[in-house]
Every structure is written in structure tokens, then in C-alpha cells.
Regions:
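C-terminal functional segments of enzyme domains
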Residues: 1-6, 42, 48, 209-234
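C-terminal reverse transcriptase regions that engage the nucleic-acid substrate
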Residues: 1-99
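Mobile genetic element proteins and their domesticated derivatives, centered on retroelements
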Residues: 17, 39-40, 59, 113, ...
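A short, polar/acidic, helix/strand-boundary loop motif
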Residues: 22-23, 124-148, 156, 180-189, ...
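Short secondary-structure boundary/capping segments
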Residues: 53, 187-195, 229-234
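A short acidic-Thr-Gly-centered motif at the start of a beta-strand
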Residues: 95-105, 164-166
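Two-metal-ion RNase H-like nuclease active-site motif
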Residues: 105-117
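RNase H catalytic domain
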Residues: 154-224
């Protein structure tokens, strides 16, 4: 509702999803038809469950492995854990929750970049940070290296930003020249297992500190300070 700046979901849909999750957890098995229905319900409810997208993609990925007309298949352990995560969130879900968007919420802006063979950098107003890759981090993919400083920043400064906002939910706008991560973070989804783990950690931090992390793509030539920091040239 744009007039009240709130998101409202039907309690009927929430209760139906909880019943479906409970049924799956009791039986430990699912058919494609049942699981497809649940995926659709959770996609609808995700708009009201803050920072929940990273816990949704595995369901759609698993759905693609199910076939029509086949016997119900046993649910893998990681999916059972995700079902319990959704069950817990839906049990405490308010029918109406406030919007979090840059137009009406507190905002902080940072700029980040990563150098594949050196390190990464973050520019936050008058504060600048840089990190030299460890031997193991050097083996990571480019999207992983671009995503890591964002998660590290929220882990380190999330509580400070939350206090600055007086406990209100707000938006952390991250300006990055990574198109891949602009999509991944905003969608809460990545096909890379390493990046998916970082997105889950980021989602957990967003819920803890009341931050909605929104990536805004920035051309490389407009991201000079973060680029120089990532190369330890500044």
C-alpha cells in the first residue's frame, strides 16, 4: 500500500504455506505438484519476509529435479533445514509490515570494488577501507571477490549504522561496477555455491541490523576511489 508505506499479505496464504511445510516435514517426501505449489506460495510471501530471497532459490533449483508422475522423493537435509527456516519466519510474520525503500527510509551509501590479484576496497564518506586477499581468497571467483567486501562491511558496521538510524529499518545503497553482483544481491540469488553462502550471511546480517542492501551499478570510470583502494594505490 503506497499510501501507508506498508506491505500486506493474506493470512490465508501464510496459513496454507505453513500447513504445506508442516506436511512436508512430517512426511519427509514430496511430489513435483506439491512442491511447485509451495514454491509459488513462498515467492508470494517473500515480499513480506525481510531478506528471505537467498532461502528461496534452493527450492526452485530442487523443483527442476522433480518429474511429473514420479513417486514422491525424499527431501535432502539442506532443504529440510530451509523448510524449517521458512516455518519459523512465517509463524511470526505480521500481516502488515513497513516498506523499506530509499524514498522514505534512512539511507547510507558506500562504493566498493575488488582487484582480482590484490585486494578489495570500500569508500564510505570520509572513511576508506581496504583488504589484502589471503592465499585462499585469491582462488575465489571475481563475483565472490566483489561480494566479499560488501558482506564484510555490513558485518563490521551494521550495528553502527543501525544505531545511527535509531533502530529504524533503512537502505544501504552499494555502488558497484559488478553487473553480476548487482543482479545477485538484488535478487538474493546466485548459481555459485560460494556466493550463495555469502548471500545467506548477508541476509542474516540484514535482518539483524534492519538494513536492506541495494546494489546500484556504477560504471568503472565512476568508481575510481574504491578501485584505487582495492589495488592498494590509495
Amino acid at each position: 500500500d503506497s499510501s501507508t508505506q506498508t506491505v500486506e499479505v493474506s493470512s490465508v496464504h501464510r496459513d496454507f504455506a505453513l500447513a504445506a511445510i508442516g506436511d512436508l516435514l512430517r512426511s519427509g517426501r514430496t511430489s513435483r505438484k506439491k512442491f511447485h505449489s509451495l514454491c509459488g506460495l513462498l515467492s508470494y510471501l517473500a515480499v513480506a519476509v525481510f531478506a528471505s530471497r537467498p532461502y528461496l532459490r534452493p527450492f526452485w533449483t530442487y523443483l527442476r529435479t522433480l518429474r511429473h508422475g514420479r513417486r514422491p522423493r525424499k527431501l535432502p537435509g539442506d532443504l529440510v533445514r530451509d523448510l524449517k527456516w521458512w516455518q519459523s519466519r512465517l509463524q511470526t510474520l505480521d500481516a502488515t509490515s513497513p516498506w523499506v525503500n530509499p524514498a522514505s527510509s534512512p539511507v547510507e551509501i558506500i562504493m566498493t570494488d575488488a582487484s582480482g590479484d590484490v585486494g578489495c576496497g570500500v569508500w564510505w564518506g570520509r572513511r576508506r577501507f581496504r583488504h589484502l586477499w589471503t592465499a585462499s581468497q585469491l582462488q575465489g571467483s571475481v563475483p565472490y571477490k566483489e561480494l566479499w567486501p560488501i558482506v564484510r562491511f555490513v558485518r563490521r558496521f551494521g550495528s553502527e549504522i543501525s544505531r545511527r538510524w535509531g533502530g529504524k529499518r533503512g537502505v544501504l545503497v552499494v555502488r558497484s561496477d559488478s553487473l553480476t553482483n548487482t543482479y545477485s544481491v538484488n535478487a538474493g540469488s546466485s548459481s555459485s555455491p560460494a556466493c550463495a553462502r555469502l548471500l545467506r550471511e548477508l541476509a542474516s546480517l540484514q535482518r539483524r541490523y534492519g538494513l536492506w542492501v541495494l546494489l546500484s551499478w556504477t560504471p568503472r570510470e565512476k568508481n575510481v576511489v574504491a578501485d584505487l583502494l582495492s589495488k592498494f594505490s590509495l
